[in-house]
């Protein structure tokens, strides 16, 4: 398993910037799991670019504030996704061309996909609620959010079914099961 993770990091499809707030700690390597899931998502989406993703691990109070500010929903949530790209069709990277300078980091040349914010408290409580490990819940939330960064949504049943199938595919690829 460790060899698989090292190989993935050497192939490096992305830069991952992680910031952590608060006192709650998750008892696994959050960076390693995030990199593994993000890499699998990029591969399955057939992303033609090296990508940049920002990940903020926070607590309920902070994500509650962001959820209210960004979505008008007055409660904490498990994950928020802030895509940088507007796709015509989910996962269709053809809307981006080399001329779309604002889509790429001028220093690294990487495609700036967007930001993911995860509540560590929700990772722990939902893992307990659903009867699986926090590592699995965290990986699932990263997979879910990556699909939002690719333009997928789950507001209507048809989109939800597609998104759920893709989430399952990502989770199977990284080998993290319920």
Predicted regions, residues:
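An acidic/histidine-cluster motif and surrounding catalytic segment
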Residues: 1-139, 147-178
């Amino acid at each position: 398993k460790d060899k698989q993770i090292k190989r993935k990091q050497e192939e490096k499809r992305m830069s991952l910037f992680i910031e952590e707030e608060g006192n709650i700690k998750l008892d696994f390597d959050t960076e390693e799991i995030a990199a593994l899931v993000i890499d699998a998502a990029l591969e399955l989406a057939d992303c033609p670019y090296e990508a940049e993703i920002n990940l903020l691990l926070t607590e309920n109070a902070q994500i509650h504030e962001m959820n209210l500010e960004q979505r008008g929903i007055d409660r904490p949530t498990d994950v928020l996704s802030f895509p940088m790209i507007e796709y015509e069709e989910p996962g269709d990277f053809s809307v981006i061309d080399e001329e779309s300078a604002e889509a790429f980091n001028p220093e690294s040349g990487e495609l700036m996909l967007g930001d993911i914010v995860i509540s560590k408290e929700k990772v722990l409580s939902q893992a307990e609620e659903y009867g699986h490990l926090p590592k699995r819940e965290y990986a699932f939330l990263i997979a879910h959010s990556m699909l939002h960064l690719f333009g997928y949504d789950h507001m209507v049943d048809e989109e939800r079914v597609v998104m759920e199938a893709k989430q399952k595919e990502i989770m199977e690829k990284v080998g993290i099961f319920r």
